[in-house]
Amino acid sequence: MPVMNMISETVQSLYSDGVQRVGLLATDGTLQAGVYQQELTAHGIDTVCPTQAEQAEVMRLIYEGVKADAPAFDTTVIADMLVRMEREGAQRVILGCTELPLGFDRYGISRQNTVDPADILAQAAVLAAGYAIRN
């Protein structure tokens, strides 16, 4: 089995789908390192990132919501951010931290037009192993 890069697989999937602009949600460190942005730019895909206040709320969702196993979480800022990203032309939003899809599901945030890199990597691994993807 070849070594697979989740970021590369995610960006390649978006590129293959003709996506030209994406929103990117991730931890502070991932955003600051620019690992998604570099790969997206190399494929001609523009990135819409959270504002500073929105990013603080993304981090709160990850750490005070999902990791703390909080039973409830106010998702207003996250929902408004997704609307803003779409308004700014984002065709998809990458949930670039494994806790984000969990938080979206747990707290009822719509996953419409979101991309889970772990799902894309799993599908790529199945295909690389010579199997078909079942729906």
Question: For the regions a protein language model found, what residue spans apply to each?
Answer:
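Non-catalytic structural scaffold of enzyme domains
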Residues: 1-135
